[in-house]
Amino acid sequence: MFDVESLLKKLNVSEDKKENILQKEQLKKNLETLYTNFDTDNKLLFTLACTAPKKIDILIFGILINENVIKNDATLRASMKFAIKNTDVTYEELKDFILKNTKSKEEVSEIINKACLSGKSKKEVYIILKNKLPFEDSKYLMDEVNKFEIDTSKSKKVKDWLEEGEVSMLHKPGDNPQLNEKILKDHLERTGGKVVTRFPPEPNGILHIGHAKAINLDFGYAEKYNGICYLRFDDTNPRNEEDYYFESIIEDVKWLGFEPYAITSSSKYFGDMCELAEKLILKDKAYICELSNEELKKRRRMLSEAFETDKDKSIEELGLILSPYRNREISENLKIFREMVEKKHKEGDYTLRFKMDIRSKNPMMFDLVGMRIIDCDHVVTKDKYNLYPSYEFALCVSDSLEDVTHSFCTREFFTRQESYKWLLDALEIYKPVQWEFSRLNISNTVLSKRKIVPLKKYGIELDDPRLYTIKGMRRRGIPPQAINNFVKSLGITYAETIIDNKKFESFIRDELNKTTQRVMCVMDPLKIYIRNAKEQEISIPNSNQKIIFKPYIYIEKSDFKMEDDDKDFLRFTPNQSVGLYMFGAIKFIKFDNDMIIAELTNETPKKFIHWVSCDSIKVTIRLYDPLFRSFNPEEGNYLDNINLDSLKTVVGYCDDRIKGCEVEDKFQFQRVGYFCVDPDTTPENIVFNRIITLI
């Protein structure tokens, strides 16, 4: 009989993980399926068992791992994505997909060498390689990059945003004051004096450009000082959390080019938080309250308004009671709390509240809720708990348990500093320092999940290229390095402003100009027959590529004018020749059934234009404009401000250089703009998204 525990022991799985695995029936089934059929020493099978979506046939993947076709985590992730998109995929189809996308050692070496000699920084090179070699192991790529002495003298210098302003003068590890010397000494022994940061998203939505600023700060600060950064999920509200959001956030962070030291979650510490809550009760720093949420909010509001009116009076003088349960006996509090932990009460019966210093008159010190019952299973802990810590409890304790030295958060958390410090001192545990920075607000869009979700009724999903979600920007074709450079260019400030999206666009163009291949594409075709021309091969300058010229071509309708009434129009007219890029000049002969008859000429043209042969590749092109008409859609009802013409779809014709393109490949369509291959692409129809215009 299959013994899961023996297998986990053999694989050296930690006790925490083992306990979590043993609660998951599907995961145990996966392990049994794989390890009774294949080599029990292969740890990649364990990764497959833990990460496989229900939709895929894990036996097919197990066979491919066993045959060494799937060799690493990166190939496994990419092939699982393929299987999800292509339901009922066969062994042969999946194997063919992997082999087609797996580069030879020589090809990988060539791509790495070229990237490392590009003049970009190591981080930029790593991002390029991750995108070009998605089937290669991340650690291998980073090791290869680190072997190179990379010369960045060719690259555009970006100022070090962490060496300007207050962020450059933050405390060093060990300089942040603690309740006593022992706490500080123990902390430094655990960390070795390293900088420790964390990025703590809630897994209830997807990341956007504002998060990219926080990610760059959290990971960048740790990297600058040779420290570590955790990716920690703040998963304290099981009703709003989904597996998809956990996976999506990890994918987005890595796509931006950052590797967490470890991926953790507040739920990892739920047991510790129950013990710490008992400690607070025993110290008379917490109590069990029976007030409803509505009554609790009402009393907090009344107290806040009373302090505003009579600033010098105490709560006793005001005659207000925050909670009639505030002075409940410690033994009674402890008894009820233990019953809550044991699931003997239902949602709404009780909450654990901190017994804080109300004299501070800061609303964030009005006995915040520390733990509450939510009758809902958790994505990670399943049905182990129904008592969950509040955000205020979980963030502080998780920061402390992970020995975070610099706890970065946006400025609206400034009022929470006092409660943050109070709680950790009350618990007599290590206390990180919080430091606030301004949110990133960008023009012509909305960023919050609360405002993005209602856009669904307009057909706008979370990954819509018009949104500034990480998924949306990636789908549109915006390079991760452009996002990183943009947010770093803004610096770290406390003042909140709305940044014009045109500033962001300049970073996008700068990056795409350096990295995209130029091709020709005609989107509003006018047919021309060049009657004295012959089919021929044309070599592309500075490239080993060639395209075929044929006498029947398309040009843009806007490049031809029948009237000669505009002296500033220097392109094609009945009396003015025009140059065809990489070919030669043509002159107008006549119109024939909506087609121009032309001839090659030796005249020197005033302008050259792009063109394609009439049998070029037909493609679908999506032209995106800002989703909202106004600079700040937040003013008034943002839904009334939607630009209903922000997406136009046209048919275009591209030259043969796009053959073999893959999803997320990017091109510059000469004289038109930058475009990216969309996931809606099929073998029969390539779909392009316009990333941005040339100017």
Curated annotation (Swiss-Prot):
Residues that coordinate or bind L-glutamine: D234, Y391
GO CC, alphabetical: cytosol
Pfam family membership, one: tRNA-synt_1c_C
Motif ('HIGH' region): 201-211
Enzyme Commission numbers on file: 6.1.1.18
InterPro entries on file: aa-tRNA-synth_I_CS, Gln-tRNA-synth, Gln/Glu-tRNA_Ligase, Glu/Gln-tRNA-synth, Glu/Gln-tRNA-synth_Ib_cat-dom, Glu/Gln-tRNA-synth_Ib_codon-bd, Rbsml_bL25/Gln-tRNA_synth_N, Ribosomal_bL25/Gln-tRNA_synth
GO BP annotations, alphabetical order: glutaminyl-tRNA aminoacylation
Superkingdom as given in the UniProt entry: Eukaryota
Motif ('KMSKS' region): 446-450
Keyword rRNA-binding: no
Keywords, alphabetical: Aminoacyl-tRNA synthetase, ATP-binding, Ligase, Nucleotide-binding, Protein biosynthesis
Example of a GO MF term: glutamine-tRNA ligase activity
Catalytic reaction annotation: tRNA(Gln) + L-glutamine + ATP = L-glutaminyl-tRNA(Gln) + AMP + diphosphate
PANTHER family attached to this UniProt entry: GLUTAMINE--TRNA LIGASE, GLUTAMINE-TRNA LIGASE
Family designation: Belongs to the class-I aminoacyl-tRNA synthetase family.
Name the record gives this protein: Probable glutamine--tRNA ligase
